[in-house]
Amino acid sequence: MAEYTLPDLDYDYSALEPHISGQINELHHSKHHAAYVAGANTALEKLEAAREAGDHSAIFLHEKNLAFHLGGHVNHSIWWKNLSPNGGDKPVGELAAAIDDQFGSFDKFRAQFTAAANGLQGSGWAVLGYDTLGQKLLTFQLYDQQANVPLGIIPLLQVDMWEHAFYLQYKNVKADYVTAFWNVVNWADVQDRFGKAVNQGKGLIFG
């Protein structure tokens, strides 16, 4: 059975400073993300054993645990690619045009995404996604690691609003963290995800 693995980063832990500290990135990647990977693999093993035993109550429990930990692994894998020491500025090309079409302007999109991040209660993520059914962009709040995700949505840009992502540096002032986040957004990665979502997402749910 294949196992999930912790991805290497494309940059050093300190490369996103001063916006996100190296200490946070090291703990975030080597401890928190690693824990989600380990949790997903453990849940997968227990799920396989429960299925072989025909233990349906255990199956449901381990499916729930797998959804949480695998959600954490997927979200963080996108997160690291969404960031770059050479990030910031604004998107260009087809993504920029789609943002203008859906939100009115980049500034209006940024305000909406920022509000989703700052207004999230508890732990979770703010997400810019592509709706493969409606063929449009949208923002939403993702609760914990896997809840409140609309069906048919492909995530393009995410900001981690769990406290482990910012508390060591920004304490309880998460609005400052979200402001700093915009300085390291890797728009080339977001553009690449958008292109794949548009071109490869057609017909995945409705033929």
Curated annotation (Swiss-Prot):
Q: Name one GO molecular function term.
A: metal ion binding
Q: What's noted on cofactor binding?
A: Binds 1 Mn(2+) ion per subunit.
Function in brief: Destroys superoxide anion radicals which are normally produced within the cells and which are toxic to biological systems.
- Carries keyword Transmembrane? no
Matches recorded under Pfam families: Sod_Fe_C (PF02777), Sod_Fe_N (PF00081)
Cofactor(s) in the UniProt record? Mn(2+)
According to UniProt, the name of this protein is Superoxide dismutase [Mn]
Return the similarity comment.
Belongs to the iron/manganese superoxide dismutase family.
Positions binding Mn(2+) in this chain are: 28, 76, 160, 164
EC numbers listed for it are 1.15.1.1
